[in-house]
């Protein structure tokens, strides 16, 4: 019975991830368009489509996934076919398991494991690694260039991402996500104790999500879609779905690691935590979208130098601050 309950909770968490990932992705698109004063397709939509899709475009990310799923999948003849086909699937599996390690208002399956943060870090890395492998296996020059850019960006943003998460773990004296939440609930949000780690994490997320100024791997005007250029049909649908879930995952990880997971109320007011959690996720995406709309694209060498010169030192300063706070008994 316990196993059945865990399966039900896991399915529930995944459905929450799909719903919230879709909404956050839509929110990012909407904000980005508004900041650039662009109009959406609703103004020129056929009347027959409006009856099916409704007046809102909030499900547009899922529409994109569903549309691509119905398209024909073309595998390049000169590609490493097995690697090319399996890479998007492994990336999707990695982000799906990572979602189960990330609490949503105390709701989690694997977040209480003593090594949850280590597993989460490896799974987040796995997504980028298999995108690199897929692009390199495509035999396309655009895919190869995109894979190389993805690899360089991976080296730049992965260190501050992991360092920031471990800065939070040091303060909580645990690698369990549930313990990190409980620490913040009984003390202060970690963003107040260690703003350096939160700052570094924010810029690392920009790179992981390929948002400006770090959208170099799949810059459309330069290399079409980068490592995803040769993907089509169901495989491209899987990639879109993975990116949507990654939007949810990284937003949730930031809120959990630095903003108490939105758990500020107890007792009869506990349901308000759900609204706080959602509000913090939307606020985080708003900040991401603002930077995305305001910044031009860096060259890959500029992006790597930016991370190496500014974000890495801030991330290591956050790690040092966490060690000092713990060793001096402040926390």
Give residue ranges: language-model regions.
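Alpha-helical transmembrane segments of multi-pass membrane proteins predominantly involved
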Residues: 1-331
